[in-house]
Amino acid sequence: MKRQTLKYSALAACIGLSPFSALIADEATSFSEILTKSDTKFNFRYRYEYVDDDKSPKEANASTLKSRITWSSASYKGFSGLVEVDNVSHIGGENYATPSNGKAGEYPIVADPDGTDINQIYLKYKGDSFTGIAGRQRILHSGQRFVGGVGWRQNEQTYDSVRVQLPISTAITPVKIDYSYIWDVNRIFGPDTNGGQPRRYESDSHALYASFSPAEGHTIGLFSYLLDFDNASVNSSETYGIEYKGAIGPVSIAATAATQSDYKENPVDYDAEYYMAELGYKIKGVALAAGYEQLGSDDGEFAFRTPLATLHKFQGWADKFLVTPADGIEDIYFKVAGKVGPAKLAMFYHDFSSDEGSDDYGTEFDVVATYPVNKNVSVQMKYARYDAEDFSTDTDKLWFTINMKF
């Protein structure tokens, strides 16, 4: 009860002070224009997903539709609001497993369960000195490696939180501060999850990201994530890190280092490190990149985790490493991306191994093509193939997606 009172007191206090921004309609000049100048958007995303995983006796064939309506008020004296509702429905037979449909073990998992939910609902304020938002919202930090929205799945991950963004002037360079207090994490598993995955993390967490540019084209970010989950204490951790992104001529550079340890009621006592380095080069419209990413292990007992990340974006689209193996993981990867006419193409190759010991986990090949039919409609084909060695099982995944926005 005390925890609930704290949540809503923080929400009420922030609304009274002010809060932050995303989708905005026109500026209102009177209170009545908050509604008359509001904006409504619709988004529909159809997806067919095929999964052939050697550990399951049957192949998954999932046909789903996400329908989204987003209403945003006009801004009045810096204040505005937003409400966004999503529905996910399967089309045809339910020949796949979700955490809630009782078919795990028969079919591979396709984490797009049916359901209707409020995806976002918040009050925001944007002023000259700061922006802030209170309510259910997206929080996407940097490349979403540590805090993200998992926008790839039909049901998005959003956060019940109070968020404040502050620009701070210093004698050297402006610094941007982004702080969030998070009391619930609304995960991708839908409103009716009754399987092994909780639909939300009950949270008492803090997320802080600060960035500055020491020179044009170069950015340094500092971050701290204190994650405390009542119903998933094994994911409770404290993480501190630094990242750099920049370019020298046609060469792009990215690097991150972080350290993590157990926090609050986590039953595991551990310390682990994270490292990432990537070099890219662009020539005649083709982007090339090579990188190394390590999620370290503490003597093979437990490894570095990022439970709030957009995990599908990293370590292969076959999603074999959503939870880091106890021996950790090293990923050496290569990327080629470009365009053929209006179509965007990208290919990835990953070579996975353990951080602790000498296990060869396997390799993965990924390819995607996206074609814009017009400004409102796009189609995408995407494929992932994971070839297992010492970890998991051979898996093929294929997706066909149609995205429509109005």
Question: Where do the PLM segments sit?
Answer:
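Beta-barrel outer-membrane channel/assembly domains of diderm bacteria
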Residues: 2, 14-16, 20-139, 162-172, ...
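Detector for outer-membrane/organellar transmembrane beta-barrel domains
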Residues: 217, 245-355
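Surface-exposed coil loops of outer-membrane beta-barrel proteins
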Residues: 95-120, 129-233, 238, 300-335
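Secondary-structure junction/capping motif
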Residues: 27-30, 202, 271
